[in-house]
């Protein structure tokens, strides 16, 4: 299941420092004290503002890629879906988020082995957009 509603894209540019050094996920290294540039998340996540919307995920079918219930997805309606993309699709009147597989057979693949693949009719499958990013909070509100 997917909770579908649009969040307005803000024309206001909010930037934050983007550090030159990467952050080690393994053995820590000494921190660098300088900033490479400012990062605007609108620039980073939204390539086509007129074709982009945000939607919250619901359910557990995509947890193996780190997409959890409540996460905010950035969806581009103008992006052409390709094999392997994460997409928002309509199946039997319901919206769903799944990995699109075009070969060997058209499949909407959940990224959690507890869920079964969906084999939609190619004539009726509607893709509403490609998920280009998602925001996963690591700390509760």
Language model: regions and residue ranges:
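Catalytic Cys-His active-site segments of thiol-dependent hydrolases/isopeptidases
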Residues: 107-113
């Amino acid at each position: 299941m997917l909770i579908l509603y649009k969040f307005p894209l803000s024309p206001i540019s909010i930037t934050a420092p983007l550090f030159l050094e990467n952050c080690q996920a393994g053995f820590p290294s000494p921190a660098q004290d300088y900033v490479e540039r400012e990062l605007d998340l609108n620039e980073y996540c939204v390539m086509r503002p007129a074709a982009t919307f945000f939607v919250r995920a619901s359910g557990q079918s995509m947890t193996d890629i780190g997409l959890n219930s409540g996460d905010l997805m950035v969806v581009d309606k103008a992006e052409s879906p390709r094999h392997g993309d994460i997409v928002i699709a309509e199946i039997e009147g319901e919206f769903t988020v799944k990995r699109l597989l075009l070969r060997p057979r058209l499949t909407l693949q959940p990224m959690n082995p507890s869920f079964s693949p969906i084999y939609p009719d190619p004539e009726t499958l509607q893709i509403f957009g490609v998920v280009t990013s998602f925001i996963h909070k690591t700390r509760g509100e």
